[in-house]
Amino acid sequence: MTTKEQTIKEKIEYWAANLKLLEGLERYQYIIEQARLAEKVDDQYKLKHFQIHGCASKLWVVPKLKSERLYLLVDSDAFITKGTAAIIANIFNGQKCTDICAVTKEDVARLGIVEILTPQR
């Protein structure tokens, strides 16, 4: 598991390495397990303004800012979506907003999760 002291790039490398070890069904099972392990989001936060629109599943991303660091709570009605969001939230949780803004799409692409997402996710 990652720690809050790790940088974004270190967390990306951790998750990318874990995901690359798995193929096919095993990768999906791993992502589903991340969904099960993710912190529960109270129903009071499952509001329209926290919902990601355009996603086939219902996905809520609840941001919190503490001491100039971002924390994300995520939930979904679909395990693959929730697991994927939980991995991304883990990468960015506890990071400074300036560090998050420096992340490129190439950095995130190293995770290899784009391939499993449909256009609706």
Identify the residue ranges that each predicted region occupies:
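Extended low-complexity intrinsically disordered regions
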Residues: 3-45
